[in-house]
């Protein structure tokens, strides 16, 4: 049973989210990191050159975030996350030290929680903000066009949209539902979502 609730075994790989948002970073840093839609393919190409084969880049006023998936195992978590931070820093013309303490890195279950939270607009400055799903969809479309998505990332993103459908209305009407609705069983929700895709 433990294996069944492990996202690594469910997905045969590792979910990873690296970013800077309104809680982790200054507005000045986020402004420097902001990625216009037309620049996203270049960032995705740099990520691919850095060894990241599945990723989307979500850039809004609240965050700049790379949602990624690594097939199989990851030899060095810190090195993998560092490469993503370096790509973002290069885009923002920032030195790595300027990013220190202003970014977050989530792996596996925590990464999936983050994807779900962002998609459902639970991690926004304004909880339940309806524009977020459109921003996620646009980022997903750009990643697909750049051939930067495959089974692992697609599965997580589809589950995130299903999760959003479950929580978005209650959250918009009562933000106090945030913790109980989102964080109770994200991996079980992912399992159920995968089962409906098979």
PLM regions and their residue ranges:
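A glycine-rich (often HGG/GG-containing) alpha/beta subdomain
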Residues: 2-124
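Glycine/serine-rich phosphate-binding loop and adjoining beta1-alpha1 elements at the start
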Residues: 98-197
């Amino acid at each position: 049973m433990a294996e069944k609730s492990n996202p690594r075994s469910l997905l045969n790989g590792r979910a990873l989210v690296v970013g800077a948002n309104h809680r982790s970073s200054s507005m000045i840093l986020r402004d420097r990191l902001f990625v216009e839609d037309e620049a996203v393919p270049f960032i995705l190409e740099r990520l691919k050159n850095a060894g990241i084969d599945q990723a989307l880049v979500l850039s809004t006023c609240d965050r700049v975030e790379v949602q990624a998936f690594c097939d199989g195992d990851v030899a060095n978590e810190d090195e993998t996350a560092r490469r993503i931070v370096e790509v973002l820093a290069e885009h923002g013309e920032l030195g790595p030290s300027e990013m220190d303490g202003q970014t977050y890195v989530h792996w596996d279950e925590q990464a999936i929680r983050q994807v779900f939270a962002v998609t459902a607009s639970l991690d926004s400055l304004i909880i339940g903000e309806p524009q977020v799903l459109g921003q996620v969809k646009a980022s997903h479309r750009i990643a697909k066009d750049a051939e930067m998505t495959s089974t692992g990332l697609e599965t997580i993103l589809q589950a995130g949209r299903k999760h959003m459908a479950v929580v978005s209305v209650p959250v918009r009407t009562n933000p106090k539902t945030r913790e109980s609705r989102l964080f109770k069983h994200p991996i079980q929700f992912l399992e159920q979502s995968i089962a409906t895709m098979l």
